[in-house]
Swiss-Prot record:
Its main location: virion. It holds the Pfam family Phage_T7_tail. Keywords: Degradation of host capsule during virus entry, Degradation of host cell envelope components during virus entry, Host-virus interaction, Viral attachment to host adhesion receptor, Viral attachment to host cell, Viral tail protein, Virion, Virus entry into host cell. Functions as a receptor binding protein (RBP) and probably mediates the attachment to the host capsular exopolysaccharides. Displays a depolymerase activity that specifically degrades the K8-type polysaccharides of Klebsiella pneumoniae capsule, which allows the phage to reach the host cell membrane and bind the entry receptor. This is Depolymerase 1, capsule K8-specific. Coiled coil: none annotated. The N-terminus anchors the RBP to the virion. The central part and C-terminus probably binds and degrades the host exopolysaccharides. It is found in: Virion.
Length: 749
């Protein structure tokens, strides 16, 4: 008999398009479902799948949680494709369609019967590895039973076995106490083979050194056996021989020995000695030694989260942290994803160790708070918060990815807080990555505690933030933090020109090396990647020194200094994304910059961007030192800079292009401030001129165009001017400054 299923087919998930292997009269008779062993989801045409062709469909939804795609034909028996009326003309095509619909209904009924619980070749019902549900309790001896009946029966049997185990344990405890009674002058009990005979023995060895002088009797399962009647004993070898009845498996055998003196010293020196000495805690020395050994092993191997069986990931992590702190060890994570439904709380001296790039802690869909946080860590911006009572110290995290699970949609408010929130001192982060977070990526703060172990400074290295809704990485506090390889990509996605990639402050100083911020489109955040952070590097505090870095993609400034005595050196920064902004904003005193200002982004008009802005309308800056090579941007905008001999701007200006790219200065240069800008050669020819100006009050604009011409307002230079490196070739453009063959300074008329 043909047993093939014709109208139902299942495919494994993994593809997006699937063939329809059977014919059908209407698309409404075809059902597409996602299937798992304990779940099924019927999909809707157009919104959740669509037809690629008459014989092929394409899924439009994720298949997470399912392992099969089922395509089934279910022809309606009530919705007739052809409806005959009296007096109508019968056509062969209509008859064929009607006949096919009837055949389809019959074929589907046959398949349904085969798939329900068919008989196998031997006539047995075949459940085909599926559960049989709602099964009534069995009554007759040949009836099937359900799980409740089985559990009840096993529970009764387990209770009986438990009673036997309790009695056995009581016997062993009684014998152990009797053995430990070192006050007995004569009579030391020996339990053979830990209370369980192997079975078949007619004798055994009493493992006591030296061998007992005598064994007056044995107790076998409570029945006394006397020497000379039921067995013999050799005091030289310590062997019991000639048992009248061989022992049976699990017989409980106790030998009562006789010695000339109570051997306390010998007992304490034996392998059982430590188990006979008690401690004040109620345990024995042997038990305490075992605890110490376990502590030593734990300190070497760490407390493994996966060793806590039967718990959720959150419960297992909490238990591992508590145990690690108890034995002064660390928490070891496996290379897998841990899903948490509450924050992972880190008390002082907590150490988490994962496998770099493979261990991941992810918030479940039910949790919208911080994923990992220090104990009692306050909420808020750690650039400003100072709550000493909430601090922890000595928290270490190595090689762990922390994610909130955000997909980058503005209406998904579940993931609104930080991936990582640590408020403390002496924190060490190494190889930590945070991401997919609608709030802040990593919020790190606290004040220095140099007077205690694990105090200042905190150390952050190889720390990265990706796909962040608000601020990327905040390094707060005043604990002289040391940082290395800090990377932020795609921060500030929730709102344009509001947040920062890396923020440092408010005081105490941070030492940093190899910083990198940038912004790029990503398929996971397509609705939001147009939003860009306000600042790449935001310096809100004092005495911060950053060297070696790359900054691009911010809206208002790649580097913004609002603190004091800060230095950023050996870095490269690119033009801002928004127009009329600046690459480096100096809004705090005593700032030093050394680096390269790169060409603007493709869609940023260069003539509307400054490499540097000194001061704001509300903030006057002084003691600023800038040494830079500027390419393709206006050099510096003096907005609000003052202080005698306090502003020094030196550098080279790159090749001119569109109008305004070669602008040297806009705004007002204060008296007695140094301004040195040198035009760079291009293809062996000097395009501009060396310009050294001092005391040139009221200078508003200087342009250097592609031919070396000086143009713009205030064309005549006042004050002290030195022109060097001028071309000796006679120019063709009027107004160009050059040197003739006799060394005379001339201007082409």
């Amino acid at each position: 008999m043909d047993q093939d299923i014709k109208t139902v087919i299942q495919y494994p998930v993994g593809a997006t398009e699937f063939d329809i292997p059977f014919d059908y009269l209407s698309r409404k008779f075809v059902r597409v479902s996602l299937v798992a062993d304990d779940n099924r989801r019927l999909l809707s045409n157009i919104t959740e799948y669509r037809y690629v062709s008459k014989t092929r469909v394409k899924l439009l939804v994720e298949t997470t949680g399912f392992d099969r795609v089922e395509i089934r034909r279910f022809t309606s028996a009530s919705e007739r494709i052809v409806d005959f009326s009296d007096g109508s003309v019968l056509r062969a095509a209509d008859l064929n369609v009607s006949q096919i619909q009837s055949a389809h209904i019959a074929e589907e009924a046959r398949d349904a019967a085969l798939m329900a619980m068919p008989e196998d070749d031997a006539g047995n019902l075949d459940a085909r590895n599926r559960k049989i549900v709602r099964l009534a309790p069995g009554e007759a001896g040949t009836d099937a039973i359900n799980k409740n009946q089985l559990d009840e029966t096993l529970g009764e049997a387990g209770g009986i076995l438990s009673d036997f185990e309790d009695v056995r344990d009581e016997i062993i405890q009684y014998i152990s106490k009797f053995t430990d009674d070192t006050g007995a002058v004569r009579g030391v009990s020996y339990v053979y083979n830990n209370g369980r005979a192997l079975g078949g023995e007619t004798g055994f060895h009493i493992d006591i050194t030296p061998p007992p002088l005598g064994v007056p009797y044995l107790s076998i399962n409570g029945s006394k056996q006397y020497r000379g009647y039921h067995f013999t004993y050799d005091p030289i070898t310590g062997n019991v021989q000639g048992l009248a009845t061989p022992l049976e498996k699990d017989d409980f055998v106790v030998a009562t020995t006789t010695e000339s003196v109570t051997p306390i010293e010998d007992l304490y020196a034996s392998t059982q000695g430590a188990s006979m000495i008690g401690t004040l805690s109620g345990s024995t020395v042997e038990e305490r030694i075992a605890e110490v050994e376990q502590s030593v092993l734990d300190s070497i191997d760490g407390i493994r989260v996966d060793s806590f069986i039967g718990m959720t990931d959150s419960g297992a992590i909490d238990a591992a942290i508590a145990e690690a702190l108890r034995v002064n060890s660390y928490v070891k994570f496996s290379p897998r994803v841990y899903t948490v439904d509450r924050p992972v709380i880190l008390p002082s001296k907590t150490v988490l160790v994962g496998t770099q790039g493979l261990t991941k802690i992810v918030a479940s869909a039910s949790w919208n708070g911080p994923v990992v946080m220090s104990k009692d860590a306050p909420a808020g911006d750690y650039l400003t918060i100072n709550v000493p009572s909430a601090m922890v110290y000595g928290v270490y995290i190595f090689g762990i990815i922390i994610e909130s699970g955000w997909k980058g949609t503005t209406d998904d408010s579940r993931y609104h807080t930080e991936c990582l929130r640590i408020y403390g001192a002496g924190t060490i982060l190494k190889g930590v990555r945070v991401g997919k977070c609608r709030g802040d990526g990593a919020n790190l703060g606290g004040r220095g505690l140099t007077a205690i172990d694990y105090g200042a400074p905190s150390l952050y290295s190889d720390v990265r933030a990706d796909l962040i809704g608000k601020n990327g990485i905040t390094i707060g506090g005043s604990s002289d933090n040391h940082t290395q390889n800090i990377v932020v990509r795609n921060a500030g996605l929730l709102e344009h020109d509001v947040y920062y990639c890396i923020g440092i402050g408010p005081g105490g100083g941070t030492r940093g090396n190899e910083y990198h911020t940038w912004h790029s489109g990503d398929a996971q955040i397509t609705p939001l990647y147009q939003n860009r952070p306000k600042y790449g590097l935001y310096l809100a505090g004092w005495d911060t020194y950053i060297t070696n870095g790359h900054f691009e993609g911010a809206a208002s400034a790649q580097i913004a200094n609002f603190g004091g005595r800060n230095q950023v050196t050996n870095v490269r920064a690119y033009s801002t994304w928004d127009q009329d902004k600046c690459t480096v904003l100096v809004a705090g005193p005593a700032f030093k910059f050394v680096g390269n200002i790169g060409a603007p982004m493709n869609n940023v008009p260069a003539n509307r961007c400054h490499a540097f802005q000194l001061g704001t309308a509300d903030i006057q800056v002084n003691q600023v030192e800038i040494t830079a090579q500027v390419n393709g941007q206006k050099f510096v905008n003096y907005v609000n800079a003052g202080g005698s001999n306090s502003i020094a701007v030196r550098g080279t200006l790159g090749i001119a292009g569109a109008s305004g790219i070669g602008t040297l200065v806009t705004g007002t240069v204060p008296d007695d401030n140094e301004l040195t800008i040198i035009a760079e050669p291009y293809k062996g020819k000097r395009l501009g001129l060396n310009l050294i100006l001092t005391g040139d009050k009221g200078l508003t604009c200087r342009d250097v165009n592609s031919t070396g011409q000086i143009s713009g307002v205030n064309a005549l230079l006042t004050g002290k001017v030195m022109l060097t490196g001028l071309s000796s070739d006679i120019p063709t453009t009027p107004g160009t400054v050059y040197v003739d063959s006799n060394g005379n300074l001339k201007v082409k008329l």
